[in-house]
A protein has these predicted regions:
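Amphipathic, well-ordered alpha-helical segments in soluble domains
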Residues: 20-23, 50, 54, 115, ...
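Amphipathic alpha-helix face/heptad-repeat signature
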Residues: 13-16, 20, 112, 143, ...
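Short, contiguous alpha-helical
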Residues: 32-84, 125, 129-161
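Short, exposed beta-strand "edge-strand" segments with a Pro/Gly-rich flavor and a Y/T-containing core
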Residues: 6-15, 37-41, 103-106, 131-138
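Short, helix-capping/interhelical loops that line the mouth of catalytic, cofactor-
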Residues: 2-9, 60-115, 120-123
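Extreme N-terminal tail/first-helix region
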Residues: 1-26
Length: 161
């Protein structure tokens, strides 16, 4: 049975990169002040490092192990509009990767935030020129939306108290 006193995941909606960064900065401040609880398993530092890693992949290239097999790509491309506009579902794993994803290093929240901020500023300035390994070619707006939906998913597990 679930703990009724455990923090509940928050539903977030970011319209801009600046909105997402403002929320991350608020969470880092709450964490520093000892006012941050988790609805999920990841610390804030791990969460921000993970978000930074995936934003950096879009800009610098994806490792082979995160490329989806063809049948999965076909399904995900059919779901692209729904994911980009409505959000991501918690609990999805990337293939057979340990931990279900990559970018899971534990880092101080300030370090994760600095990396993510740098990557998001690059993304804001120009669109990635590579294909996304799951969704294929994306417009600049779609790349931004994808990163915002990813941030909503993970930052929703960080609960200021």
């Amino acid at each position: 049975m679930a703990d009724p006193d455990a923090p509940r995941r928050r539903t977030l909606r970011f319209e801009t990169i600046d909105d997402a960064l403002a929320e991350a900065e608020r969470l880092v401040a709450a964490d520093r002040e000892g006012r941050l609880a988790r609805a999920g398993n990841w610390s804030l530092g791990k969460t921000l490092g993970h978000l930074a890693t995936w934003t950096e992949f879009a800009l610098n290239g994806y490792p082979r192990e995160v490329h989806a097999p063809l049948p999965v790509r076909v399904i995900l491309r059919m779901m692209r509009g729904r994911i980009l506009n409505k959000g991501m579902v918690p609990g999805v794993k990337v293939g057979r990767l340990p931990g279900g994803t990559v970018g899971l290093d534990e880092v101080p929240p300030e370090v994760g935030l600095a990396r993510w901020r740098t990557a998001l500023h690059r993304l804001k300035a120009s669109a990635p020129t590579i294909d996304n390994p799951a969704f294929g070619r994306l417009t600049h707006e779609e790349w931004v939306k994808l990163n915002l939906r990813h941030a909503e998913l993970h930052l929703g597990n960080q609960v200021p108290t």
